[in-house]
Design a protein with these regions (language model features):
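Fe-S-dependent hydro-lyases/dehydratases of central metabolism
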Residues: 3-168
Length: 168
């Protein structure tokens, strides 16, 4: 497992005790995950669904070779030295499945080498975990390497929320 959940689990009982003390009512699993990931724990209250906005601090972020370049360019404008949240970059969306894994990866590497080179370099420089083309689809990479019960992950891929159904 590339993400260490020990810190999360060490802090979880204290956070849950505070949530229970403030809300004083039974909570759904989703509420437990959301309330223990509030960016400002001191701003905790019983938020009104559909009315209140909340700021969350996920445990990790993830992106892929389609959504990632634009997010990274935005990050570069911030002039930050490192990313503030553990994050991963998976190169999978630019691989087209046509003739089989080996020939398709060769085509992807040849046609997308500039993008892959940029993402690898920036990932190393700013602290992203980098998964090159051929590592697997991002949904599975995130699920198998970063998912843990009670955790929260922000990902730029519309299918990745399926990880929530398996514990995160």
């Amino acid at each position: 497992v590339l993400f260490r959940s020990e810190k999360f689990y060490a802090e979880f009982p204290k956070r849950m005790a505070r949530v229970r003390a403030v809300l004083n009512r039974p909570l759904t699993l989703t509420e437990k995950i959301i309330y223990t990931h509030l960016y400002h724990q001191d701003a905790m209250k019983d938020f009104a669904r559909g009315k209140d906005y909340i700021e969350l601090r996920p445990d990790r972020a993830g992106t892929h070779d389609i959504g990632g370049p634009m997010a990274i360019i935005q990050f570069l404008t911030s002039k930050k030295e490192r990313i503030a949240l553990p994050a991963a970059m998976v190169c999978d969306h630019l691989v087209q499945a046509n003739r089989g894994a080996i020939p398709d990866l060769k085509v992807a590497d040849k046609g997308n080498w500039e993008t892959y080179s940029f993402l690898r370099t920036v990932s190393g420089r700013y602290g992203f975990d980098f998964w090159p083309a051929g590592s697997g689809i991002c949904h599975q990479v995130f699920l198998e390497n970063y998912d843990f019960p009670g955790g929260m992950m922000l990902v730029t891929d519309s299918h990745t929320p399926t990880a929530c159904g398996l514990g995160m």
